[in-house]
Design a protein with these regions (language model features):
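Internal, hydrophobic beta-strand segments that form the core of beta-sheet-rich folds
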Residues: 87-92, 164, 169-218
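N-terminal edge beta-strand
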Residues: 54-81
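Bacterial Sec-dependent N-terminal signal peptides
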Residues: 16-44
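Extended, solvent-exposed segments with strong compositional bias
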Residues: 129-181
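Short beta-strand elements
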Residues: 211-240
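Beta-strand cores of secreted/periplasmic/IMS beta-sandwich domains, seen most often
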Residues: 76-95
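Sec-dependent bacterial lipoprotein signal peptides
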Residues: 1-19
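Short edge-strand/loop segments of extracellular domains
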Residues: 104-125
């Protein structure tokens, strides 16, 4: 009798396990491979708008993404004057449809940030040399993130600065996405030509913050916790 009861209990346990594993709702979700499925569309056109804040004069470029990189309709450099401030806006399109809103969504804002690295000669790839490159940039120009909410309106049109509402520790601090921002040129600079590598980093982790919870600096892009959604190089001329 005990053997029959033991067999019956074993049968019930096995039946329960099989039934539980067969429920679709209880099956573990298969995580997305974000190197392939980014969770947003990939743009095929970019509009770059540089505005001199002292004159409101604009210099606009349109870039088309090709297998060989971004090809611009205008190869002339953005010109910055010593002591000047320049608002820089990046607008992404898919077949002429604006998609910036996808990068500031509840899911995408925490894991997207633009980085701006200005350099002369060849871009430095080693970590130590890139740190020196960033210091050299800081001696010439600095950048301040100034993304807006909603993203398709300006501050003068009633938009507000976009905040890190997703950051439970600092929900009232600025969200560094980089679709909009301001470059401030130092006053004691010489007339020189530069290149600026702009990359939109897609972070492969919970969010784009450093492990200590601090924001990453605009010209210090990490190399192992992200993939670039976009990378483009722009000519910059600074005039004394």
């Amino acid at each position: 009798m005990k053997k029959i009861l033991s067999f019956f209990m074993t049968f019930l346990v096995l039946a329960f396990i099989v039934q539980s594993c067969g429920r679709d709702g209880d099956s573990p979700a298969v995580p997305n491979d974000e190197t392939k499925d980014r969770g947003h569309e990939m743009p095929n056109k970019i509009e770059l708008i540089m505005t001199d804040l002292s004159t409101n004069q604009q210099h606009k470029k349109v870039g088309v993404l090709t297998p060989n990189g971004v090809v611009y309709d205008d190869e002339t450099p953005f010109v910055w004057k010593a002591g000047g401030k320049y608002h820089f806006e990046i607008v992404y399109f898919v077949n002429d449809r604006r998609i910036n809103s996808e990068f500031v969504s509840k899911e995408m804002a925490p894991i997207h940030q633009h980085f701006f690295e200005m350099f002369q000669g060849e871009y430095q790839t080693s970590e130590n040399k890139r740190k020196e490159q960033a210091k050299a940039m800081d001696r010439v120009v600095t950048y301040e993130y100034q993304d807006t909410d909603p993203e398709n309106k300006s501050l003068k049109d009633g938009a507000s600065i976009r905040l890190r509402t997703w950051d439970t520790n600092n929900p009232t601090e600025i969200d560094p996405i980089g679709l909009k921002g301001v470059f401030s040129v130092k006053t004691d600079v010489e007339t020189q030509d530069y290149k600026m590598l702009v990359r939109l980093a897609h972070f492969l982790r919970k969010n784009k913050l450093q492990d200590n919870g601090k924001v990453r600096k605009y010209n210090e892009i990490p190399t192992i916790v992200m993939v670039p959604d976009i990378a483009m190089t722009l000519p910059i001329r600074i005039e004394k």
